[in-house]
Every structure is written in structure tokens, then in C-alpha cells.
Amino acid sequence: MWYQKTLTLSAKSRGFHLVTDEILNQLADMPRVNIGLLHLLLQHTSASLTLNENCDPTVRHDMERFFLRTVPDNGNYEHDYEGADDMPSHIKSSMLGTSLVLPVHKGRIQTGTWQGIWLGEHRIHGGSRRIIATLQGE
């Protein structure tokens, strides 16, 4: 059985955001599978998806500070005509990735107790973000 749906995440400020509930709420009509895989593909080149700490928001703040130091906006980038935050956003997106594959068991994603799905919004004004969710299972 295959199922696919386009999800839209609301616009977020620059930084890392816990979006597990926002994604799962949009997948409420997803067919229930006993065992399967859920693939999430973020359709953007200046944001990222990753799994990380879902409880303490300071982890997200520390992650953002790390990436701002590691890939600064004021770098000497050739690709700069879309703004000072654009090229660093592409780099961060490539470092973290834009897709996740999550196991599904009895209709629920099987993340660890402390794991949540994060959106890394790397633009100052990124806007809404689209995710293609594809479920395969039985």
C-alpha cells in the first residue's frame, strides 16, 4: 500500500522548530499500516529536516547558535544576490539534509522518547514550507 500527501508547514522565524505535531496533525487521514516506512521530503533548498531533542527548547537555540557561528551570513560568498542569508542557508540545508525516513508500527511513527522532527529554517524570512509525505506499508 502506498499513500502520498503534500503537507504545508506554517512560516517560521529563523532557527530550529519542533514540527512533529504539525506534521502528524496533517497526516491524521493517513491510512493505518501495521508496519511500514514514512518518507518526508522537504521541497526547499534553504531549510532542513532532522531528528533531535523534543523536550528541552534550549537544544534548538544552541543548535542555531552553532550554525550561525559555523556558517555565518557575512561570509565571502559568490552567490549573494538573494540576500546575505541565502548561501549560508543552502550550506546548512546540505549539511543537515532535507529528508527523513521513519519506521511506522501500528499506525504510529517509531521515534525515540526524546526524538522529535525539527524544521531548520535557515532564512530570516523563509515563508511556509512544503513536505511530500510518502507512506509505504501493509
UniProtKB/Swiss-Prot annotation:
Chain ranges passing through the membrane: none
One matching Pfam family: UPF0047
PROSITE patterns: UPF0047
InterPro entries named in the record: UPF0047_YjbQ-like, YjbQ-like_sf
Domain of life: Bacteria
NCBIfam families: TIGR00149_YjbQ (TIGR00149)
Family note: Belongs to the UPF0047 family.
PANTHER family given in the database record: UNCHARACTERIZED PROTEIN YJBQ-RELATED, UPF0047 PROTEIN C4A8.02C
Protein name listed in UniProt: UPF0047 protein YjbQ
Provenance organism: Escherichia coli (strain K12)
